[in-house]
Amino acid sequence: MLKEALEVVTAKRDLDYGQVKNLLDSILEGELDEMKFGAFLAALKTKGETKEEISAFVDAFYEKAQKIEYTHPKTIDTCGTGGDGKGTFNISTASAIVLSCFDLKVAKHGNRSITSNSGSADILENLGIDIQAPPQRILEGLEKHNFAFLFAPKYHPATKKVATVRKSLGIRTVFNILGPLLNPVSLNYQVVGAFDFEAQEKIASVLKGKRKRAAIIHSLDGLDEISVSQKTRVLELQGDNIKEYYIDPKEYGIEYTLDDIKGYTPQENAKIFRSILNGEVSAYYWAVVLNSAFALYIAEVANDIEEGIALCQSAIKKGDAMLKLKDLQQHYKVGA
């Protein structure tokens, strides 16, 4: 089956959903020919993955995932693809904690660092949050504190089977866009940062019609976040509609360089995050406020980004955001 699929994609022909899904099901249930599968992933990338092919990957791995059975009308995730190569501070992770100050249930899907100095799991660990909390504590955390961190390897054991192939290839493949599409919690709202414009469009095509409202973002200076230095392209999804527009940070009086939001070690990033929650105004502060504000708009908490900025600044100024972090540290205490 893998040999036939490899021949098709090498000839630059598309596979349909069923062909890819059946292939992946057989691979995940049986033996994996790593060399052939690596060649298949590389050929698929060269050809360009279609919506149907990506959807088959999502469904095959989601079926094998350990799910968190939690239903709420205001579930949201801010997980991006990562891999933009810019080495910035953990903006989406910090934003996720700010968002949990509001009437939202933030199911933050994430992993350790792959290309940056510090991944979402790394910074949260340094903030004293148990990234491998048991499911019951996750459910209680969502219900009582509006936040849970879902450590990807814990919920997606099937990905271990292909980890060696991915590592040996050393190139971006379809797997680089799967992370945000595989949250173990059912989501109604989502903001997804993409590592390039092509990935942005592919993710939008796959997510279309699957969330109440979502946005896929990529900035002109290459970030999988809303940038504080350049315009960010947004593909906003509502129902079957995709709306394209740009966010200019200058419109909100925000103007910094990429160097101003550089990320460091997990320990240093945790320190920066505490300074943000203490209200110390900096490029980091504005990056987190702007990204949080946009997520509030997407999640229908704020009517627009401007209102979202005011809400986020107020949550930080009043101390709600710092109090939220302390509550999360207590609830998700390691060994508790």
UniProtKB/Swiss-Prot annotation:
GO terms for molecular function: anthranilate phosphoribosyltransferase activity; magnesium ion binding. It is an enzyme of class 2 (transferase). 5-phospho-alpha-D-ribose 1-diphosphate binds at residues 80, 83-84, 88, 90-93, 108-116, 120. Anthranilate 2 binds at R166. The keyword Cytoplasm does not apply. Its EC number is 2.4.2.18. GO terms for cellular component: cytosol. Its cofactor is Mg(2+). InterPro entries: Anthranilate_Pribosyl_Tfrase (IPR005940), Glycosyl_Trfase_fam3 (IPR000312), Glycosyl_Trfase_fam3_N_dom (IPR017459), Glycosyl_Trfase_fam3_N_dom_sf (IPR036320), Nuc_phospho_transferase (IPR035902). HAMAP family: TrpD. This is Anthranilate phosphoribosyltransferase. It comes from Caldicellulosiruptor saccharolyticus (strain ATCC 43494 / DSM 8903 / Tp8T 6331). The lineage of its organism: Bacteria, Bacillati, Bacillota, Bacillota incertae sedis, Caldicellulosiruptorales.
